[in-house]
């Protein structure tokens, strides 16, 4: 059965309903942003109300709002593409506070050390809800309560893409992030997510063909960006610079080295934390077609960010659900899920090497 779509404005005021459409595909991500694409036949009731900045959501899932960014109209159909609501963060970079001095060097680094949730909220406040330049503020966005979850690590950013900083915090600490609409209060909320471990106990979630909730799976073991030994540089210059290493036991072909620059850090313990954050294990992942049947169903028994047990090809792995692509077409829903970190992409490698430092 095809679900209708509700349409609202950025102010969360309802604009109308789209009772039917040809197809809807959207990707939810725990650490990254995700995307969506909607196809509607011209003449469908409500089609002419579709426009950029429109929020779309399924009536039974009002917390999963999609933000329209591109509209293409041809003779037969309208194609709408965009991002989940958290994609608002793609419109901002990390701008550090200005400092007095040379007008051509008026910005330093935005450094923060603390638990993962505090790090998320620090960079969200500095660039979304309470920036130094009021013109950068996202209207109607508020921060969730800080519960101080996640590992304590040092972070620094200087004109980095905000979504990349959030993705780094997430992949390093296991906590996710999102922006969700609070329809009752009429505001948008930046929230930090902590997935549930569903690998043991009465709430255990197991996915396998035998249980009828998975139809095929593929396994990937990716060592492209693996780093097991990190040299880190702190304060000082040239031969006087503070240098230390972590993970310095591997040797031979098993040794994969990396560099982390944490300028201005003179505390050895903080420098070691920065080096440890640069460690990057092999990225193993499982991609599976999920079924809306059998025991243990997506959206009912487990959700994005949860750690579940996946069994396929006589292999078993406990892994976090990091991305789900949902497709609504021809009256049915299909699901494609990624557990664990996906394979390293060229864009990811370039990003990592360009940033070079702990950021």
Descriptions of predicted regions:
Residues 80, 96, 227, 235-268, ...:
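Acidic, low-complexity/disordered segments
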Residues 1-114:
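Beta-strand-rich assembly/attachment modules of structural machines
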Residues 85-222:
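Charged- and aromatic-enriched interaction segments used to assemble
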Residues 163-166, 229-230, 272:
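Extracytoplasmic/secreted envelope proteins and their assembly/folding machinery
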Residues 28-43, 76-90, 169, 232, ...:
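Oligomerization/assembly interface segments of phage tail-like spikes and tubes
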């Amino acid at each position: 059965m095809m679900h209708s779509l509700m349409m609202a404005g950025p102010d969360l005021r309802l604009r109308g309903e789209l009772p039917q459409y040809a197809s809807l595909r959207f990707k939810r991500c725990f650490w990254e942003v995700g995307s969506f694409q909607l196809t509607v036949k011209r003449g469908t009731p409500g089609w002419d109300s579709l426009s950029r900045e429109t929020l779309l959501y399924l009536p039974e899932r009002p917390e999963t709002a999609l933000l329209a960014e591109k509209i293409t109209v041809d003779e037969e159909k309208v194609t709408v593409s965009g991002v989940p609501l958290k994609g608002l963060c793609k419109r901002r970079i990390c701008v550090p506070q200005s400092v007095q001095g040379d007008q051509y060097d008026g910005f330093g680094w935005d450094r923060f050390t603390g638990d993962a949730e505090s790090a998320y909220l620090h960079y969200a406040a500095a660039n979304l809800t309470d920036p130094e330049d009021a013109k950068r503020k996202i209207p109607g966005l508020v921060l969730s309560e800080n519960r101080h979850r996640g590992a304590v690590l040092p972070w620094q950013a200087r004109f980095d893409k905000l979504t990349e900083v959030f993705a780094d915090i997430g992949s390093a600490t296991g906590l996710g992030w999102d922006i969700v609409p609070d329809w009752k209060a009429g505001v948008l909320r930046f929230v930090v997510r902590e997935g549930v471990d569903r690998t043991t106990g009465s709430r255990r979630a197991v996915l396998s063909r035998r249980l009828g909730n998975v139809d095929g799976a593929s396994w990937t073991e990716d060592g492209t960006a693996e780093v097991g030994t990190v040299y880190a540089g702190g304060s000082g210059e040239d031969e006087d610079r503070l240098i230390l290493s972590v993970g310095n036991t591997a040797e031979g072909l098993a040794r994969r080295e990396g560099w982390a620059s944490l300028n201005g850090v003179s505390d050895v313990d903080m420098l070691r934390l920065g080096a440890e954050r640069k460690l990057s294990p092999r990225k193993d992942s499982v991609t599976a077609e999920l079924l809306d049947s059998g025991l243990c169903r997506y959206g009912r028994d487990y959700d994005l960010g949860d750690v579940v047990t996946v069994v396929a090809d006589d292999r078993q792995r406990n892994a976090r659900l990091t991305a789900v692509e949902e497709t609504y077409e021809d009256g049915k829903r299909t699901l494609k899920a990624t557990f664990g970190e996906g394979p390293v992409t060229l864009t990811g490698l370039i990003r990592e090497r360009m940033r070079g430092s702990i950021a």
